[in-house]
UniProtKB/Swiss-Prot annotation:
The gene is rsmA. Pfam families: RrnaAD. Its main location: cytoplasm. GO terms for molecular function: 16S rRNA (adenine(1518)-N(6)/adenine(1519)-N(6))-dimethyltransferase activity; RNA binding. Belongs to the class I-like SAM-binding methyltransferase superfamily. rRNA adenine N(6)-methyltransferase family. RsmA subfamily. It is an enzyme of class 2 (transferase). GO terms for cellular component: cytosol. Disulfide bonds: none annotated. It comes from the Bacteria. S-adenosyl-L-methionine binds at residues 13, 15, 40, 61, 86, 110. It is found in: Cytoplasm. It comes from Hydrogenovibrio crunogenus (strain DSM 25203 / XCL-2) (Thiomicrospira crunogena). The keyword rRNA processing applies. This is Ribosomal RNA small subunit methyltransferase A. Its EC number is 2.1.1.182.
Length: 266
């Protein structure tokens, strides 16, 4: 592809190390009959290797200047399907080829760091259609996604993603592997939506609302942050000390809190 002028507003940092690219493809382990979706292909570091393997690759790209080069390079390949759109607004359910009960989409991407959290929350809405996701993200974000209770990195993002997905930290990638090099380390994470969640909230919207409120002021206790949601007695009924901070509360306890809040509200 012709040299591209990287755009800061799209958070563009493109992979340039073939060894890392091969490691990512090996981690994804795509099979010929699978349906992959790539978000933000950039200069097609992953696109080419994936198209060599899979029967269908949907590409989501927002940058006008990349549409022409991508089309020119890959449009001859029947597996290549380009969507010139914003990944944050895209309806991923429209990619399904038929009504199916089996999650079929495998989503990959070197996600723009400036929109990674909102994009992950958007993708969680489509978890029932997704087999797995492999993303390059800012290392700090991957640490937050995979963090366990009691660790500083554990927060709202940890809870919301771990409620829906198994998470796995795969690989750290240094700035020197990108053009232009970012100011921070990156990492690759695997997210695999649960076929059946180990802990199920009665109402997912109430769960999301309560988790957001619990982490609204990280240095404050559950008692303070959940004022107006639950009282001390209700928090204790979930096996929790009202004086603990949200960062010490496991996902399953947030489900209990959410279910109690939902019933009390009703």
């Amino acid at each position: 592809m012709a040299k591209h002028q990287h755009k800061k507003r799209f958070g563009q940092n493109f992979l340039n190390n073939d060894r890392i690219i091969q490691q990512i493809v090996a981690a994804i382990a795509p099979k010929p009959d699978q349906h992959l979706v790539e978000i933000g292909p950039g200069e097609a570091a992953l696109t080419g290797p994936l198209l060599d393997i899979v029967k269908k690759l949907d590409i989501i790209e927002i940058d006008n200047d990349l549409i022409g080069p991508l089309t020119k390079r890959f449009s001859h390949n029947p597996a290549f399907h380009l969507h010139h759109t914003d990944a944050l607004l895209f309806d991923y359910s429209q990619l399904l080829e038929a009504e199916t009960e089996t999650p079929s989409l495998r989503i990959v991407g070197n996600l723009p760091y400036n929109i990674s959290s909102p994009l992950l929350f958007h993708l969680l809405k489509y978890a029932r259609y997704i087999q797995d996701m492999h993303f390059m993200l800012q290392k700090e974000v991957v640490e937050r996604i995979t963090a366990q209770p009691g660790v500083k990195a554990y927060g709202r993002l940890s809870v919301m993603i771990q409620y829906t997905c198994e998470t796995e930290y795969l690989l750290t990638v240094g700035p020197e592997n990108f053009t232009p090099p970012p100011k921070v380390d990156s990492a690759i994470v695997r997210l695999r939506p649960f076929e059946k969640r180990p802990f199920q909230a009665i109402d997912d919207k109430d769960f999301a609302k309560l988790v957001k409120q619990a982490f609204s002021q990280k240095r404050k206790t559950l008692r303070n942050n959940l004022k107006g949601f639950l009282n001390d007695e209700q928090i204790e009924a979930c096996g929790l000390d009202p004086s603990v901070r949200a960062e010490k509360v496991p996902v399953e306890a947030f489900v209990l809190l959410s279910n109690l809040y939902h019933k009390d509200k009703a």
